[in-house]
């Protein structure tokens, strides 16, 4: 029985899944919008929104906490100096998922995931 087991497997083993989600976090912070499958976007939102909440307070301990999850100084700098301050007055709901139809090759449902107040368009 799988009672109280949360999260999606996404057709991968745990190390591959963690690595893929970490790379997607880095891409989303760098480009502020990415195109992926709907299930990956929902899983990414669940992981990234708490990191944005932590990044609203710029302290050494918060930087080290996020560095333990992301391991990329350029992305951490952008998260704390650009993205975190944008959401100071907002409590949650930092990301939006926009559905974009089915992928032609395998009919997977696709979506755009982006920051709610980004200036970049689809």
From Swiss-Prot:
> What Pfam families would the database entry show?
Ribosomal_L17
Write out the GO MF terms: structural constituent of ribosome
GO terms, biological process: translation
Where does it sit, as one GO cellular component term?
cytosolic large ribosomal subunit
- InterPro entries from the UniProt entry: Ribosomal_bL17 (IPR000456), Ribosomal_bL17_CS (IPR047859), Ribosomal_bL17_sf (IPR036373)
SUPFAM superfamilies in UniProt: Prokaryotic ribosomal protein L17
Which UniProt keyword terms apply here?
Answer: Ribonucleoprotein, Ribosomal protein
User: What family does this chain come from, according to its entry?
Assistant: Belongs to the bacterial ribosomal protein bL17 family.
Which proteins does it associate with, and in what oligomeric form?
Part of the 50S ribosomal subunit. Contacts protein L32.
Record protein name field: Large ribosomal subunit protein bL17
**What gene makes this protein?**
rplQ
């Amino acid at each position: 029985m799988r009672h109280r087991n949360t999260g999606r497997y996404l057709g991968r083993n745990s190390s591959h899944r963690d690595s893929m989600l970490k790379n997607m976090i880095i891409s989303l912070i760098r480009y502020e919008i990415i195109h992926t499958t709907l299930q990956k976007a929902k899983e990414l939102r669940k992981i990234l929104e708490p990191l944005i909440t932590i990044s609203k307070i710029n302290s050494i301990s918060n930087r080290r906490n996020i560095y333990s999850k992301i391991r990329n100084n350029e992305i951490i700098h952008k998260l704390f100096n650009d993205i975190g301050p944008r959401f100071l007055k907002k409590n949650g709901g930092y990301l939006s998922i926009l559905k974009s139809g089915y992928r032609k090759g395998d009919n997977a449902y696709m979506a755009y995931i982006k920051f709610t107040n980004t200036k970049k368009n689809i």
